[in-house]
Structure formats: structure tokens, C-alpha cells
Amino acid sequence: MLDIQQLVKTYENGHQAVKGVDLAIHQGEFIVLVGPSGCGKSSILRSIAGLEAITSGEIHLAGRRVDNEKPANRDIAMVFQNYALYPHMSVYDNLAYGLKNRGVSKATIAEKIAKVAKTLKIEEYLDRKPAKLSGGQRQRVAMGRAIVRDPQLFLFDEPLSNLDAALRAHMRLEIKKLQRELGVTSVYVTHDQVEAMTLADRIVVLKQGEIEQIGTPAEVYHQPASTFVASFIGSPAMNFLAASIRDGKLQLAGKQWSVPYDANLNCNTLTLGIRPEHASLQPVDDAIELSINIQVVEPLGPNQLVHGKINGEYGDEDFIAVTAEMPLTIGDNLPIWVRVEQLHLFDEQEKRIPISAQSPSVDTRQQQRQQQ
């Protein structure tokens, strides 16, 4: 549906914001571009919209090349972070403005606006000016203005950044429900990994103008392609410990464990990744055992974050574990167990080392847990 081929964007100062990106997006798919500031996500979005000229490459929409067309001719609607509403116009006139410029009849405009206003629950605001609306109401109007155009593609440029935390959570749900209802292909830009995980059919993780990984939320969370993806997706972020592997055995702080990797794999320097929520306080089968020296405990209500030090291959390293709420003493050592199937190994280039030969016992237990 949307096909981006070898997209390059270089600015006049010589900065290359996008470095040969290839991305194919399917009809009706909700794609989220995520990454830190300067990763190229906004440059890609603005290039799709036609707000910035690309340096090289091609952009195709529904089989038609559009990168050489004016923005108004691309059949794309964009929702901005700052809403981009006309302050002197009523909500109705803001919704109608683009349709009037395209020569749509008053009757058709009224019909479209009535339908969109009902869908977004903004009927009672149609006579108000934007200044009389809350942030969430303005964002609904901004989305309504995009919807009435009936475009082939929606673009969202960090639309929730100006809202408070509670309203962001509510609007995330509204956007997801609306996109499912309309079935319009959508590309959404954010630096917030929670938005990416909750909204996306697929996530595109960007780093310094290049795609680091494309996958479903589950794939980028459970099978991160690199330490960058592993640290960016997930909150709290993944723990990283220096380790090594010899003949398929993980070596860490004088201990070793059999792990489901190539038996011939030998690596003096690798990174072991453990998600904080995968630390179990109870012994489990097929697991490695570690010990956290507790330094800080952050209570969060139903659970808590335990910050401490863990004995790694080259000395003490920072570690965070998510545990159930319980009394803990600063300075104590807290034993934890992590299933080998939940371990992540990364090589010297910080790329994921794939599991190659899981033991039947691990596979069986995984299947049993999935069936529960």
C-alpha cells in the first residue's frame, strides 16, 4: 500500500537524517516509527507527506509514485502535535475548511462533518472556537479534520505529546479504536515506547537514520535485534551484564550454566540481557541463579522496583528487578532466578545471538505456559 524505497534525506548543512530506508506498509496497517530524537522518524514522516523534499529514493502510495507530487495531491491527511487548528474559526469551520477548498458541496460537507462529529463525540463543540476546548478536545478536532478528507493514508506526528499522562492514555485508546473502525493505513511517529507498544501492528525502531528492527510489539520486545532495541523497548529498560560463553555454557562471575545456543559457540566478550520483570524470587527449572545486593527499593503499589548491584563477569554491575510488594532491607542480598529461555545474548557488535537449539524440556515448558 505504502512502499518506501531507498529513501535518503540530507539537509543543506550536510546532515544525513535518513540513510537508505526501505519500508513496505500493508493496507489498513498501523505502523509506528519510534526512536530517540535525531533518529530520522520525523524526517521520514514529513517526506511521506511532501512537507520535505527527499534527496533520493522513491515513495509509492497505492501503486502510484507520489514523492514528485505536491502534498495536496498525495491523498494523505496529517495530524500534528500542536493540533494546527485555525484559532479564529469554529470547530465546524475548521473541519470544513479543507473540503471547501476542494469544491465539495455544502450538503456533502455537512453530512461528512455530522458523521465525523458523532464518531469523535464532538457534536456539542461544533460552534466553539479552539481556545474554548481542552487539549483532548482539540486533538479530537484535529483528527476529525483529517478523517473528513477520507484519505488513503493517515500520518500522526507525535499527536499526544502536549497532553498530560492520564489524557494520553485515554487518547491512545481512542486512536486505536478509531483506526480499527476506519481501517485506514496509518503511520504514527513517537519517541514514547509505550505508545509504540500499545498502538502498533508493527513497530519500526530507528537509530541514526537507519532501521534497527521491524516487527510486531511482541517481536521487538521478546526478540530485540540489538542492545539498542532491547534498551529502548520495555520499561524499566533491560539489564545488561558482561558475560562469556564456552561450548554452549554461559560463564558469569565464576559460574556456568547450559543455555540453548550453538554448542560450538565461543565468545569471550558478550552482553547478557535480562528484563527486570523476568527476575523470579522463587527457584524455577532451567534457570540461572543470581544475587542482587539491594541499594534502593521503589514501591509502586502492586509491585516494586529493586535497584542493586549484581556480580558480573568484570565486577559489580547495576541491576533492576521488578518484584511483588514485600519488605526488603537495604544492603541485603536478594537471590533471583531467570529462565534460560528469557535470557538475551548479544555479540561484540551488540547484535542478537539467536537461539539455535532449544532443549525439549524448555520447549515443552514454553508450550505448557502458553496453554495456561
From Swiss-Prot:
Domain of life: Bacteria
Domain (ABC transporter) ranges: 2-233
An example Gene Ontology CC term for this record: ATP-binding cassette (ABC) transporter complex, substrate-binding subunit-containing
EC number from the UniProt entry: 7.6.2.10
UniProt keyword Cell inner membrane present: yes
Gene3D superfamilies the record matches: 2.40.50.100, Nucleic acid-binding proteins, P-loop containing nucleotide triphosphate hydrolases
A biological process from GO: glycerophosphodiester transmembrane transport
CDD domains per the UniProt record, alphabetical: ABC_MalK_N
Molecular-function annotations in GO: ABC-type glycerol-3-phosphate transporter activity; ATP binding; ATP hydrolysis activity
Annotated membrane topology: Peripheral membrane protein
Compartments (UniProt record): Cell inner membrane
Protein keywords: ATP-binding, Cell inner membrane, Cell membrane, Membrane, Nucleotide-binding, Sugar transport, Translocase, Transport
Protein residues bound to ATP: G35, P36, S37, G38, C39, G40, K41, S42
Description of how the protein assembles with itself and partners: The complex is composed of two ATP-binding proteins (UgpC), two transmembrane proteins (UgpA and UgpE) and a solute-binding protein (UgpB).
NCBIfam families recorded: PRK11650.1
Name of this protein: sn-glycerol-3-phosphate import ATP-binding protein UgpC
Protein source organism: Vibrio vulnificus (strain CMCP6)
